[in-house]
Amino acid sequence: MAAAAGAVVASAASGPAEGKKITELRVIDLRSELKRRNLDINGVKTVLVSRLKQAIEEEGGDPDNIELTVSTDTPNKKPTKGKGKKQEADELSGDASVEDDSFVKDCELENQETHDQDGNEELKDLEEFGENEEEIVHSQELLSTEENKTTQEFVEAEAIEDREKEDIESQETEAQEGEDDTFLTAQDGEEEENEKDIAGSGDGTQEVSKPLPSEGSLAEADHTAHEEMEANATGKEAEDDNISVTIQAEDAITLDFDGDDLLETGKNVKITDSEASKPKDVQDAIAQSPEKEAKDYEMNPNHKDGKKEDSVKGEPVEKEARESAKKAESGDKEKDTLKKGPSSTGASGQAKSSSKESKDSKTSSKDDKGSTGSAGGSSGSSTKNIWVSGLSSNTKAADLKNLFGKYGKVLSAKVVTNARSPGAKCYGIVTMSSSTEVSRCVAHLHRTELHGQLISVEKVKGDPSKKEMKKENDEKSSSRSAGDKKNASDRSAKTQASIKKEEKRSSEKSEKKESKDTKKIEKDEKNDDGPSGQTSESLKKSEEKKRISSKSPGHMVILNQTKGDHCRPSRRGRYEKGHGRSKEKERASLDKKRDKDYRRKEILPFEKMKEQRLREHLVRFERLKQAVEFRRRKEIAERERRERERIRIIREREERERLQRERERLEIERQKLERERMERERLERERIRIEQERRREAERIAREREELRRQQQQLRYEQEKRNSLKRPRDVDHRRDDPYWSENKKLSLDTEARFGHGSDYRQQSRFLDFSHRERARFPDTASVQSSFERRERFVGQSEGKKPRPAARREEPSFERYPKNFSDSRRNEPPPPRNELRETDRREVRGERDERRTVILHDRPEVAHPRHPRETVPNPSRPTSWKSEANMSTEKRESRVERPERSGREVSGHTVRGAPPGNRSSASGYGTREGERGVIADRGSGTQHYPEERHVVERHGRDTSGPRKEWHGPPSQGPSYHDTRRMGDGRAGAGMITQHSSTASPVNRIVQMSGNSLPRGSSSGFKPFKSGPPRRF
């Protein structure tokens, strides 16, 4: 391994380009290639390999093979970071030739990681070693300009280192006594450091493992570790104590890095050659001691006096350290990949990258020197300590004792863990009885499984404390190598933030710290090596480390992390003195190469790189600040927008509610108006209906009134017309009637006054009637007296009896017989009609033979008549006797009249009879020929169902005065008036004072002459068996 690495380094030194398979590249090489192509460098190795292959394919190259340009100036300066300050001193001597290319790449990766860590570490170092700062810087300048100056700086560094050793020795004892306190302090520091790392700008660097956050506690832990290591360097007794102290310091660092960082920080802290002898530095020394040794060899040419010796001594140690580092890296990579080993994302990545670079570019020379130095130390000291990493949290010391007891005698076993963070990785230190057993245990138990976890078993080379520290460093380096795989992704998460912070601080402080650390390392080496050559080498290494650290904040971070590494280099130097001489030859051969590399190296570019890193860090910080401000503004704007949106939504909701309320109000108003409108319409309809009803009622009333008026007018018209027809007819008959006598006229005079109200004015017309005029009618003179007597008697008897009005209102079918035979009633008293028709005939036949009744002419009449009316007026007897007989008979018949409806019958008959018949029935003689004429002239065969006949008056004006009806004041007119008088008294008949003079015939005429309806104002009243009523 070492030879191959040496060959690789040699080829790299000789040729700028080196062909390798991508799969064989270290993570740091992969990242450097990716960064050179401006690609993402975060992720595990597999991701980086695939990314790089893709980039190469895009470029048109071979994705499987790649040519790496390895400049001799790219020393494993990153490994110095992971290794620690003392180891950096070694690397400065050994890595000078190889630093340029790989270091540039490493620096770029470390820029993000180291600034923050270096800042805190530098602050501590400045406080602790402020007085050495100027000397260290001066020594760096001397190294870069003149070798003499370098020697002077070395002397100064020795003086400073002596003083520091004294301080460390005093503190070492306290640290041993207060291991627990230191451990707790480291834990506290770790928590604070984690917080700071989290708060950091996250550059992606891997040196988060520095105990920067807790500057106080971590500084104390680091100081204690450094002092312990330096004390251990002065004496082996202190070495044992320093082992525990170193473990504690490592644990503190590890605590800072959540367990995974323990390994990385330890590795980073223990990378220097002198650190290889120290417990913490052992791991880093194993991984990076070749670089430091190579740097030492490069320094040796400058200080050939004692540097060669130191390099000779350091070579075997460095070889062993290199081999162990390779083993640890390979084993830890596997272990960490499987386990996610304890290597911290930050420091492990840096240590790993630095160790890988040192291995790849100058691993051959560095590993040779590192193996000669560290391995030489381990062989010289016959390493009996074993460093076990990757233990599960439930592993106990007894478990380790049992496990390692299978391969030899176990003197002691110790388990270290981080109590602050649950689930953190545990580490073990096992002390075997002999180095052969150690080798056996490493051979059999490395990369085996214990309690379900893959453990890594490494030797601790050098003094017991140095061996343990070396084991830790180896394990850390291995964990770094394995952690590089893991931390490729972890770096982007944890270490980036912390490293950004640290970069700021460490950029300036790293130079001072590294210078101090290098001085300490040089002192330790001088003390350990004794020969001035070794001290000069350590001085050169320390100075070179200072330069490297100043150039690369990553290295500074490593030195800062392991302040106790200053002691470790001294121990390592002592260890190299004892065991490094065996490898002086190898170192001598490598010195030349390193000298070339160192010559090629340029120190100024590191300064520039440091400034560039600082600027980049500032830019990143500014960018981060801008991003935070932008995010804050964005959040504020978002909040304002949400608030505006909320207000808008609230307003919209309120507006909707207001509109809804308004709509509801309008709806209610509309409904109200609708109800009012409907009510108005209903009232209007009601009003219209009432008006229509009223109008209809008014029309109905108007129609009824009109009808009534029309009926009355018609009635009046009919009556007047009938009267107008009757008067001329009656007048004419009277004039020609031989049977009319004064008696009849007298009797009619009394009735004429009451027949028509309009004729009452003519009452006096008949009062002056002289009975002497009767002489003109000698035939009727005797009859007149008898008639008067009978009429007088009858008028008294009938006039007293009021005629009931009900009889007149009987229906027409009762008062108007259908035939003559039916109208006769078979009551005990013979009907009046029969009496009148038979008796009258007999009487008349007896009294007057002159009058013959012609019965055969009756059928010619159009209207049926009552049998009484059909009988012609019998010849009036001239004798009193006959007259008396007839009057007696009539009186008898009239007395019986109320008992039957003869009155109504006769009335009906009279009414139903046509006017022609009426005239004949009146007893005006045998004027049947004229009767027909009158009937024809009158209403002509027309009957009136209303029980009245409208008599048309030909050539007569109804409106004319009534006196026109009466004609001249003679018997005719007087008789006519008397005859009509009874009709005017139909409703309330009266017997006039002349009723006694009325003859039976005249009475009959009066009865039968009433053709007008009852209650009428004109016409004859119906025949009744009694005289007309008296008013």
Swiss-Prot record:
PROSITE patterns on file: RRM, SAP
Residues recorded as bearing Phosphoserine in the entry: 93, 97, 139, 144, 289, 421, 549-550, 552, 747, 786, 797, 812, 906, 920, 995, 999, 1011, 1016, 1018
Annotated crosslink Glycyl lysine isopeptide (Lys-Gly) (interchain with G-Cter in SUMO2) location: K500, K881, K1021, K1024
Annotated GO CC locations: nuclear body
Location in or out of the cell: Nucleus
Biased composition range(s): Low complexity: 1-15, 1015-1031
Superkingdom in the source lineage: Eukaryota
Annotated keywords: Acetylation, Apoptosis, Coiled coil, Isopeptide bond, Methylation, Nucleus, Phosphoprotein, Repressor, RNA-binding, Transcription, Transcription regulation, Ubl conjugation
Annotated Polar residues bias: 342-351, 872-887, 992-1014
Transmembrane segments annotated in the record for this chain: none
Post-translational modification N-acetylalanine, affected residues: A2
Primary role: When overexpressed, acts as a general inhibitor of transcription that eventually leads to apoptosis.
Protein name, UniProt field: SAFB-like transcription modulator
Gene: Sltm
